[in-house]
């Protein structure tokens, strides 16, 4: 676990816990650490699937097979080390643009880390997601 995720906490030193990178909310970090279903050691299967997924999305031919008219939404915390503080998320969006995808929306949330849906300001994220969906899904008027 340290080999794969060990550097994520460094930007938040001095660290209160080993999972400070998860959220800016100490209550959320504490809930994560107290949850027996969270924070376990990742399996080799997880790493196999993750590495396969990374390979798949970085192979340009696979991205070009995507329907260019399907809208894509990227949401990330601006302080999420998994997304390289937005740099990795921007690269992913740029790769899709290069592959011909027309409708890409990217939103980075200042002060938020990895679990943007559990941060103190999560209502902003949910509102943005709902707004994005409403603008792209057909109306269900009766």
For each feature predicted by the language model, list its residue ranges.
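Acidic beta-to-alpha connecting loop that harbors the catalytic carboxylate
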Residues: 78-81, 112-113
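Short, conserved loop/helix-junction motifs that constitute active-site signature segments
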Residues: 63-68, 99-101
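Catalytic active-site module of serine/aspartate enzymes centered on a nucleophile-bearing elbow/loop
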Residues: 57, 99-142
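Alpha-helical elements of Rossmann-like donor-binding domains used by nucleotide-donor carbohydrate transfer enzymes
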Residues: 31, 49-52, 91, 124, ...
